[in-house]
Amino acid sequence: MCDVLMQPVRTPRPSTNLRSKPLRPTGDGGVFPRLGRLIVRRPWVVIAFWVALAGLLAPTVPSLDAISQRHPVAILPSDAPVLVSTRQMTAAFREAGLQSVAVVVLSDAKGLGAADERSYKELVDALRRDTRDVVMLQDFVTTPPLRELMTSKDNQAWILPVGLPGDLGSTQSKQAYARVADIVEHQVAGSTLTANLTGPAATVADLNLTGQRDRSRIEFAITILLLVILLIIYRNPITMVLPLITIGMSVVVAQRLVAIAGLAGLGIANQSIIFMSGMMVGAGTDYAVFLISRYHDYLRQGADSDQAVKKALTSIGKVIAASAATVAITFLGMVFTQLGILKTVGPMLGISVAVVFFAAVTLLPALMVLTGRRGWIAPRRDLTRRFWRSSGVHIVRRPKTHLLASALVLVILAGCAGLARYNYDDRKTLPASVESSIGYAALDKHFPSNLIIPEYLFIQSSTDLRTPKALADLEQMVQRVSQVPGVAMVRGITRPAGRSLEQARTSWQAGEVGSKLDEGSKQIAAHTGDIDKLAGGANLMASKLGDVRAQVNRAISTVGGLIDALAYLQDLLGGNRVLGELEGAEKLIGSMRALGDTIDADASFVANNTEWASPVLGALDSSPMCTADPACASARTELQRLVTARDDGTLAKISELARQLQATRAVQTLAATVSGLRGALATVIRAMGSLGMSSPGGVRSKINLVNKGVNDLADGSRQLAEGVQLLVDQVKKMGFGLGEASAFLLAMKDTATTPAMAGFYIPPELLSYATGESVKAETMPSEYRDLLGGLNVDQLKKVAAAFISPDGHSIRYLIQTDLNPFSTAAMDQIDAITAAARGAQPNTALADAKVSVVGLPVVLKDTRDYSDHDLRLIIAMTVCIVLLILIVLLRAIVAPLYLIGSVIVSYLAALGIGVIVFQFLLGQEMHWSIPGLTFVILVAVGADYNMLLISRLREEAVLGVRSGVIRTVASTGGVITAAGLIMAASMYGLVFASLGSVVQGAFVLGTGLLLDTFLVRTVTVPAIAVLVGQANWWLPSSWRPATWWPLGRRRGRAQRTKRKPLLPKEEEEQSPPDDDDLIGLWLHDGLRL
């Protein structure tokens, strides 16, 4: 089909012998002529070199699969803001297992029961025993409060988050995940529970496993497609096999070289390996088609096989080198990007293209030498040249029509690219049948979408934030955050349940005080009668104490008489002397009877009137004023003795003495009388001593003090009654005031509910205990255990441990939103949350704090930001590299400009087709990595066809651009078509992958290559070249070498002067190839490839 597609066209030469001028070096100089001679002389050496190289690398260098497991690709750079904040939060809270998390979903469609819970506990125990692979486990066995959160509303599923060691995607994390998966499968087997593993760690594991499974299937599909296309093109099995042998050998070598780069630190992703295989097959086959087609051209012109190989390598080698350099340099330039997938795939593809290029210009020519000498790869008749010649004629005749039609199609398709919506959710790239996808489906069925995707507001400060003021400022900050659209709840130290801590609001606290005041007011009102009784009792006591004073005064007078009589009796009868004299003093008998009568009367009165002494003594005992007054205290002591004398019978004994005196008779013997009196008198004297009456004067003074104390008590009781009455009046007034105050405070509690009105305050004592900053919470006073009627310190302590770092310098809040955490809306929300939080910082305790958001939406947002940055970098870098190479190759300015423009439009059109197919028809958003990766490949590969087309056009334009376009389209149409089909087939082979991102990328690349092959290179670019004319080759005079002159313009004028036909058909068919081929690089100093 393409055997003679590269056959040069002989056209009539101008009469001027331009070829005699030293414009160009002959075909004998340069790298490729010498390389061709070497290969023709030593083909077996070249083949042996490649076989030895592959044989050396294959057993000594680990496979690319093994290296991809050791050196996985981190999507974001290590200094990405979200990763920095995550590491800081992990360090501040001394946590592990946050970077790599797997989630076990345990479900029972019949409802969770006791048997399920036993299985759950056994699984938890097994996981806790695996301390190597499990660094964090959130279960409700050890933390009962988590039960409600970890149980679905329909009571059919539990979730069990498991933290794994290492970063997400690391070798350590992958190995730990595999062992944890085995534990889960073993423990749940045979139970009523169904276990599914999901979460970020499971997603990464499934991405790697799916990529590995897809690779062999993709390679097989690509091989079959290439065999079919090559068989159609060459219709020769040997010719068809040669490119495959070359590509197979180059793949082995390239994979081991990339593995060496991986050992040196280059990250390897499974998706990159897949694209690497497709790119190597496509590029290698393209280079083989270019070389074999030119080889067939020279064979048709009569050259033998060895000469044809040398000439083909000399002429087309330069184009292949320029094409490979464009692609490789562009790919290597991707090392300057930030995203891991782009940063690593660039060097991988660059190395691969370089290996394929060297195999195409060394191994393939050597194989062609050996097979060509035996005539195994002879060309077949061209079947498409007439079609492409006719196409060229139509374009030359109506260039504007063809340009407008093709441009309209491209612009419409490119416009669809602007409607693309990009997906950053890697879950959607996986097939629904993998383990993590099944787990996510179970989660979506039983739980909210954002349950296992935590998002934190992280605040770091140089000062301790465990103060009432800082917490109040934090509450104001998160209150603003909670008002951001889409934020459903913000939980943290100041709002454990997602709402501002009610007990810490000053309005609530004022309301509590008001409640207490209202309670006091009601109690006062309810006990008004009791208070009145108190006042009446005080008045009654004062009245009774007045009566007691009167009785005491009367009793004191009688006691005074008794004391005088006893004193007289003591003086009269005291001692043995007096008693001795009684026997001779009968005259005293009458006096003794009279004295007995007096004593009996007084003693009886005292005994009958001392009931007042006990209450008086009790009042004096409880009086601090009497205790402080020495005189009152002494009188209280004497009164105590009087009460004691009454109680212990002393007064009774005095009465007995009186009765004996009264009983004295004259008929009695004096001795008997005296003997009885002596005994009685001795008893009385002892009793008087116990009463302190040994000194009558002292007793009388003490009795006077008692009298005075009773008078003071009576006076004081009257004053007490007046004071109690005053107190009662004041309490009643205070009760009315408490009612008014409580009404005001309760109204404030009910109405001041907004943060600005309510305020926020946690007492320092409670905060100190709760955060463990001072005394342990268990030792705090009971009045703080349940401060202000509800703020329990034990609950607050658990909350503080989760949201306040041990040093108090970092605080985080858990943010729950109504949005899908993988959606672009969730990513856009991050800026709003951050702005709201930072807007609350000025003039607060948080003014110098660092505020950031941590979580998956932030990771995806940073991924999008880096992707946008990298896409701009890739576009600028790729355009500059390709443009510079085209300028150097063509030694012109205008043609490279519209060529690069056509490549960009072609890329946008291909992306637009992808949007139409996947987004509009299939309802899938485009994966975020598609624009950057496809741009590099489409522009770089499109540059290959540009170089082949425009270089041949410049060669053929010596007799005019219009005729040059016809001959160029006729001669290169088949080659470009074949190359485009082969490269597109290589890309379409990736459609057999299971990963959605690979399928989308493959479709866009394959479609873009076909679009570039059949529309841009065969219609749009030739039409532009015809319209631009000789200006295609314009170059500023300052850039022109000394020997440069516009060949096309001078020869074109000569041709137009002669008015020759555009296509001298006979000469065209017989024209030999031009040894001094204009295609390739040529510098004025004589150096060339």
Curated annotation (Swiss-Prot):
Q: Name one GO cellular component term.
A: plasma membrane
Protein topology in the membrane: Multi-pass membrane protein
Q: Please list the residue ranges that the record marks as compositionally biased, kind Acidic residues.
A: 1066-1078
Membrane spanning segments where?
44-64, 222-242, 257-277, 316-336, 349-369, 400-420, 555-575, 874-894, 898-918, 930-950, 973-993, 996-1016
Question: Sorted alphabetically, which keywords does the UniProt record give?
Answer: Cell membrane, Membrane, Transmembrane, Transmembrane helix
Q: Which InterPro entries match?
A: MMPL_dom, MmpL_fam, Mycobact_MmpL, SSD
Is Transport a UniProt keyword of this protein? no
Q: Residues annotated as region Disordered?
A: 1-26, 1056-1078
The record, for SUPFAM superfamilies, names:
Multidrug efflux transporter AcrB transmembrane domain
Q: Where in the cell is it found?
A: Cell membrane
Pfam families hit by this protein:
MMPL (PF03176)
Similarity field: Belongs to the resistance-nodulation-cell division (RND) (TC 2.A.6) family. MmpL subfamily.
Query: What more is known?
Result: In strain BCG, the sulfolipid-1 (SL-1) is not synthesized.
Q: Return the protein name.
A: Probable transport protein MmpL8
